[in-house]
Every structure is written in C-alpha cells, then in structure tokens.
C-alpha cells in the first residue's frame, strides 16, 4: 500500500491544524475519572472565614459569601474518600476536618487545599470506628470514635493520643483543664487533661458536668440554612443509582432497592442527565423503590417506571399521567388486598413497541400492554416452578435477535429466563452445571445479564459470572460455561473466571470487553477473549467511589463507563468506543490534534471499524506504530516502535478493516 503525499499538501495540513489549535475541543483522556454527586440535602454547615462548607447528601461543597461562587469537592480535586459522616471547622488551625464513613480524614483549607490524614482509617482498633462527633479546642480536635476519644493536632495533621473508655462516646467537652465524656454505659466521665488519660484509671464517673454535654451539635446550620437552601450546587438530586441506562445520548437512572434484603425502601424518583451534563430530577407520586424503566422507542419523552410496591407509572414530558396497579389493570399484589405490594420488577419494549412487565409473586408473572393500554398476561409453564411463580424476574436485556433475557434473583429457583416476543415462547435456563458437567453449587441469585458481541449471554450470579454460548442457547438442558483463565505458570491448569465473587452488574464495551461490577470487589474489566484481566478498579487504588457496585452503563460514542455505587455515581473514560460500521472520510478523528509540545499523554484515534488494523506513518511513508483498534478506538502513545517520542511533523493514520479492506486516512500534527 503506497501513498503519494506532496510537500504542499503537508504544508497546508500543518497550517490548517495550527489554526485549529486554539479551537481544539478538550476530550477526557482514557483513565480519567469523573463524578456526578448529589448536593441537594444540606446536613451540616460550617462557617469558614469568608465562606461556608456544606455537607449535603453526604458530599461537600464550599459557598463563597462574597461572590456567591460554589466549589464542589470530590476525588478529582483532592478528596480522599466518598461519603462524609462529619465536618467541623477548626478556626485556629484554619482547616475543615472532614471525616468519611470509612474513618479516613481530610483536612481542607478555605482555599481548598487538602491534606489527607489516614491514621484513623489505617489504625487497628478494638470495636467500631464510627465517628459520633468532632469537638475542637484551639488547634486540637477530639473525635468521639466508637468507645474511644482520638485527640488530633489539626494544625500539624497527626494523632496525638487515643483514650479508650469502654463504651460508646457520644460527646466530649474540654472545660477548665478537665475533659468530660458523655458515654453510653457509664454516663458522664471526667479526666484531668494534665494526667495520663491513656490510662483508663485516670477517668472516673461524675455527677458534676456542663449540662451542654447532652446538647446535639448543630454548628452553623441554623444561622445559614436559609442561604444554603437556595444554593444549587449542581449534580443529581440523590446518590442512589440501582439501575442505569444510556439511551439516545442521555443517562437515565432509578434509585430502587437492592434485592438482597439490605436496602429496600429507597428513593422513588428517577433522574436524567442530558448530553450537556444537565440533570433533570423527576418528582413522582411513587412512594418507594423505582426499580426499572422503559423508554418508548417511538417517543423519547414517553416512558414507564416500575416500582417495587406501587405498580407501574407512566410519564410524558417528565410528568406522571397514569398509574397502573391492582384494581385498574391486570397487575396484582404479592399480598392480596394490600396495594403497597404491587411489584413490577422489570420492564422492556419489544420490536412491535409493546410494553412488557414482570409482576412478581403473583399468578400472572409476565404481562404485556399494547399501545392502546390493553394488557394481557402470558402464563407460560416456564414462568412457574413446582406450581409457584418465579419470584424476582428483573433486569431485562434484549439480544441481537430481539429475544429478551431476564434474571430470576431469588433462591427459590435462580436462573436465566428467555422470552421470544414474536412467538410467546419462554425458556428457563435452570440447568446449573458447567461445560464439564460439574454442578454449579451455592448459586442462590442471578443478578444481571448482558450479551457480548459474539452472541454469548453473560449472567452475573452470587458465585461469579456464567456464560451461555450460542450453542448452549439452543436448549435449556445444555447448562452453562464457566470461563477458565489459564494460570500461564507452566502447570497447564487454570481457574474459573472470578469464581466465588458476587457479580451485581455487567456491561459490554465497544471492544467486546466485559465490565463486571461486584458486590464488594469493585469493577473488573475482562478482555474480549475472556482470558485476561485488563483492569481491576477498587476504591483503594483508583477513582472508584465504593467497591459495592449497583449498576454499569456505557456511552459507546465516548467510551465513558458510568458506574453506580453504594456511595454515588462516577465514570471512567475507557479506551474503547463503539466501532463504526463503515470507515468514511472525515469519520476517523484523533485528539488531541494538534499535539502541543508539553503534551505526553495518549493520542486517541476514534471512528474506526471493529478490530481495525491501524498503521501510523510519517510523511516519508515509513511505519512508526501499528496495532488494532479496541472497538472503534486506537490509542497511540506518540512514540515509535522503539519507544522514542516522535519528532515534529504530520503523521498519517492508515486504517484497514479486520478483513483487510482499506479504510480512511486522518492526519495528526505533532509540535515539539
């Protein structure tokens, strides 16, 4: 393959790119973490010099009283944790003490400079590390931590000493050289601050103490709540994202409740973030637990919300227009006569634009509704086990043939269920054994399902991921595949992929990689051939907010992976986008472009076809770098094949499809 490139063309390209330099759109680079945190519910307010620090919905922002500017804080600008439990301004040290629910501590100046103080988080302590209160005395702060008092020097950011009192400490006060502690079991105790208070013998009960030791701490809340209540710090309204969908360029989420019995009675609202990052929160008449959503494929302003208790709600243009429940529809209550238990756990549209819903724990577990609002039930035998309906049918996904897959998340009969809306056939894949006929033991819940680009169906269970190959999908009797990952240690042995790890969410990116969210182990990214761990994100070593993952959704255009966690919503920019069906002139693009002299990061090339061959050559036609796209994206490090940074000039990106057909050419200008 040869290309004649004239000197004049190169000059014109360089000049054009230099003119574009000031207008280059800033793209988030792969590996960048972003946060979408709620600030809608003020919980604590601390006056700090010329501004207010506000803990709201468990997160932190600063409001400048002079210019009314708002600065939100998260991991991207220095914080070292997720949800906050307490904040307290230390006026003498000029720092805010911010304590997270995991007992990590950040000290923050009024200018936003953050110093991490992980001593308490890393300390080994008997009993709980739950912080009940922060009390300051000059530049010293006393933390009521479980049954202990932790004394810290705020100005110098270190722990001075710890006093253990034997029962929960609710409050402390330093008065006239004495330290008073309000404890759960021993009432008020006191010790002379000049004594060695590490020794429990130097503490004793007292009936003489400041009465205010019983007062609840309100800080500056009452003085400034009238101001704070008018502040819009942006972001979503709540931090609960039990399910996520990325549809038509918008992110949708419902808060819902977990089905493991741990977090029911959560928010009944649903939220939407548009392509510009603006959030819309929809207040609804629902009482609790919005758990699923279906957007009308013919009208994006028309959608339905399923609830775990109040039936089905219909919305148009963000306004509720109808409720379907027991008494006015085929929906029934799991507890006859009690309309607070009308459970709709899953929703989906078929290709005929009919709405399907699951009605858990009733004799009509699957119902569909046409565009006129007429409902009919589909009481297929596969929806029942020993005469009892499958209990929790949820999290539907549609495969490339139009068939719909759901999970049954109850130990009564855990399985995958497949529905063919064209024929009304239902199959229950309940043969819990693997490809070697080995029984799959201790599985009590199927939690999520996703289809990869090879037509395999992936199921996340409480014991790890399982897969149904296209051949296994031909019959429910064929069992499942447990992926074996070679150890590559010369033994010839392998291990089952993520065996024993509870999988709660799954999504497939443009490169056919599996993003697997877990109950307590963060997020794994598995290669397209299923044998390599591409990445493992945890809250300890990445920007992930929490290791407890509830949902994952991917924007295939940008490669942004949205992750709903126990502590809120975050996203990481991946190096995979959806592949272009056909590479066309102008469709392949690179950024940053041009590449500035001080830039040393990755150069992203997008708009490629799946598994495209990518070659980067200089103006002389010499090969500089070569690789294959991940989905529609190829990442170039700006170096040649020997790892050396390339010189200034224009570099041509030559692409070809996976079957060898030539694609398009784009150019990258590099300025050293």
Protein language model features and the residues they cover:
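Glycine-centered tight-turn motifs at strand-turn-strand junctions
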Residues: 623-646, 657-661
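Bacterial Sec-dependent N-terminal signal peptides
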Residues: 1-33, 356, 405
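Glycine-centered coil/turn sites that cap beta-strands in beta-rich domains
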Residues: 582-615, 633-636
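Short, glycine-anchored, charge-dense loop/turn motifs used at functional sites
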Residues: 614-624, 651
């Amino acid at each position: 393959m040869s290309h004649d490139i004239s000197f004049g063309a190169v000059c014109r390209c360089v000049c054009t790119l230099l003119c574009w330099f000031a207008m280059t759109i800033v793209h988030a680079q792969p590996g960048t973490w972003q946060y979408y945190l709620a600030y809608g519910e003020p919980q604590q307010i601390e006056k700090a010099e010329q501004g207010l620090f506000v803990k709201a919905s468990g997160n932190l922002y600063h409001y400048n009283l002079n210019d009314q500017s708002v600065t939100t804080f998260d991991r991207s600008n220095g914080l070292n944790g997720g949800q906050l439990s307490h904040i307290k301004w230390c006026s003498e040290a000029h720092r805010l003490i911010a304590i997270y629910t995991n007992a990590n501590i950040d000290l923050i100046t009024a200018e936003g400079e953050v110093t991490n103080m992980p001593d308490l988080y890393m300390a080994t302590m008997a009993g709980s590390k739950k912080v009940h209160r922060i009390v300051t005395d000059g530049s010293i702060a006393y933390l009521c931590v479980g049954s202990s008092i932790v004394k810290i020097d705020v100005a110098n950011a270190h722990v001075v000493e710890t006093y253990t009192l034997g029962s929960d400490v609710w409050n402390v006060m330093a008065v006239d050289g004495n330290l008073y502690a309000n404890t759960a079991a021993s009432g008020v105790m006191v010790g002379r601050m000049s004594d060695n208070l590490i020794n429990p013998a130097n503490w004793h009960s007292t009936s003489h103490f400041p009465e205010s030791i019983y007062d609840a701490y309100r800080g500056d809340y009452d003085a400034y709540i009238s101001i704070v209540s008018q502040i819009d710090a942006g972001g979503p309204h709540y931090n609960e994202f039990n399910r996520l969908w990325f549809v038509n360029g918008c992110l949708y989420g419902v808060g819902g409740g977990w089905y493991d019995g741990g977090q029911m009675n959560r928010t009944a609202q649903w939220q939407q973030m548009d392509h510009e990052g603006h959030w819309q929160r929809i207040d609804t008449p629902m009482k609790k637990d919005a758990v699923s959503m279906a957007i009308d494929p013919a009208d994006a302003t028309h959608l339905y919300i399923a609830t775990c208790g109040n039936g089905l709600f219909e919305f148009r243009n963000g306004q509720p227009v109808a409720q379907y429940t027991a008494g006015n529809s085929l929906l029934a209550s799991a507890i006859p006569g009690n309309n607070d238990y009308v459970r709709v756990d899953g929703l989906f549209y078929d290709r005929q634009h009919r709405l399907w819903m699951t009605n858990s724990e009733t004799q009509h577990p699957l119902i569909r509704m046409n565009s006129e609002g007429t409902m009919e039930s589909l009481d297929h035998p596969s929806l029942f086990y020993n005469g009892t309906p499958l209990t929790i049918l949820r999290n539907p996904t549609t495969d490339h043939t139009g068939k719909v897959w759901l999970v049954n998340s109850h130990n009564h009969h855990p399985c995958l269920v497949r529905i063919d809306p064209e024929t009304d056939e239902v199959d229950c894949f309940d043969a819990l054994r693997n490809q070697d006929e080995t029984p799959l033991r201790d599985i009590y819940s199927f939690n999520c399902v996703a289809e990869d680009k090879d037509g395999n169906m992936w199921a996340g269970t409480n014991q790890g991921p399982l897969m149904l190959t296209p051949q296994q999908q031909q019959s429910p009797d064929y069992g499942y595949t447990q992926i074996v990952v070679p150890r590559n240690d010369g033994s010839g042995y392998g291990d089952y992929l993520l065996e024993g790890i509870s999988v709660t969410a799954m999504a497939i990116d443009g490169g056919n990689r599996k993003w697997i969210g877990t109950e307590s182990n963060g997020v794994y990214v598995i290669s397209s051939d299923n044998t390599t761990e591409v990445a493992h994100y945890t809250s300890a070593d990445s920007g992930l907010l929490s290791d407890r993952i509830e949902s994952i959704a991917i924007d295939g255009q940008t490669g942004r992976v949205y992750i709903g966690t126990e502590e809120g919503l975050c996203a990481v920019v991946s190096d995979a986008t959806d592949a272009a069906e056909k590479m066309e002139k102008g469709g392949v693009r690179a950024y940053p472009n041009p590449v500035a002299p001080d830039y040393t990061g990755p150069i992203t090339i997008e708009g490629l076809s799946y598994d495209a061959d990518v070659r980067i050559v200089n103006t002389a036609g010499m090969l500089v770098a070569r690789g294959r796209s991940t989905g529609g994206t190829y990442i170039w490090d700006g170096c040649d094949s020997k790892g050396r940074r390339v010189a200034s000039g224009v570099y041509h990106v030559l692409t070809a499809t996976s079957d060898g057909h030539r694609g398009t050419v784009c150019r990258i200008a590099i300025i050293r």
